[in-house]
Amino acid sequence: MGIEEFGGGQAAQADVLVVTTNDVPGYQVTQVIGEVFGLTVRSRHLGSQIGAGLKSMIGGELKGLTKTLVETRNQAMERLVEQARARGANAVLMMRFDVTEAADVGTEVCAYGTAAVISKV
């Protein structure tokens, strides 16, 4: 299993830059558009839950659940970028993830941040 299955992030040539910082070195914020978010809820897969339960008894990484969470975060990020792009932003500053259990049936992942327009200094 490669890094692409267990990692995430943004493509190098993305038209909407997403950062976890307040600013981007070499750029200035010319317009703050406001909060944007991308949200997804994934249901639990019974097979993964049984496997995770057994694995947790003997220890080790729960690779099936890890892969699902990575996919879920990546989908939330894609939706965040779509929202920012639709509002005319070319950057999302101060991006964060929030992960919550959703009524014992799944996991809610929200990627959120501040949509902005930035330009080179």
Curated annotation (Swiss-Prot):
TM stretches of this protein: none
A Pfam family matched in the record: YbjQ_1
Domain of life of the native organism: Bacteria
SUPFAM superfamilies in alphabetical order: YbjQ-like
Family: Belongs to the UPF0145 family.
Protein name: UPF0145 protein SGR_4080
Organism: Streptomyces griseus subsp. griseus (strain JCM 4626 / CBS 651.72 / NBRC 13350 / KCC S-0626 / ISP 5235)
Top-level taxonomy: Bacteria, Bacillati, Actinomycetota, Actinomycetes, Kitasatosporales
